Amino acid sequence: MTAHTEKLGGRLPLLDPLALSAAQKEIYDRINATFGPWAASIDFQARTGDGRLIGPFNPILYSPGISSSFLDLHDAEEKYTSLDERVRQVVILSVGAVWKSDYELYAHSAAAQRAGISENAIRTLTAGGLPDDLSEQEKIAQRYAREFSAKHRIDADLYSAAVHAFGEHGVVDLTYLIGIYHITCGLLNSFDISAPDQRV
């Protein structure tokens, strides 16, 4: 493993896929079967050349019991959410901007571009701003994600606007999504995990 590869783990050593426990190997295979093809399809790096997982996926391997349930929640959000993909990516980038989480912004800039969000809007979102070329619903999602992430509360006017835009079911889904990416950014920032390049 090169010095550059070692840095991709931040404070945690990148786990060798040939030295995993049975429980870790189950999580590793699950990530490779789901996130691996997704990462490849939108052109961001989720593992090294020798198969070590990077980004949030490496710390996820360290605690397979809890991580299995976290991945279940992530999968359920993707499967059952009432939010469209553009709104989801606006929310995820807005959370990442508050956390200043380089890898999350790197990966989801690629996902946002695939969802049809303009490069200018992506740059603005990753800087913590509100792009002009979003829909009104997307702008409300950005404001909600940013306010909740920064202040841990939503004021009454913004809550009313969110319910008008998404319905109560949609606001619950919005809140679940924000929470999932608080955990993701927390893993990345706790272990000082950076992006593998300077895309964001």
Place the predicted regions along the sequence by residue.
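Transmembrane-helix boundary/entry motifs in multi-pass membrane transporters
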Residues: S21, G167-E168
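A short structural micro-motif
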Residues: F35, E77, A97-V98, G128-D132, ...
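Helix N-cap / loop-to-helix initiation motif
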Residues: L83-D84, G116-N120, D155, G167
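Histidine/lysine/aspartate-rich catalytic loop segments that bind and position anionic ligands
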Residues: S109-S135
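Acidic/charged, solvent-exposed loop-and-adjacent secondary-structure segments enriched in E/D, K/R, S/T
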Residues: A145
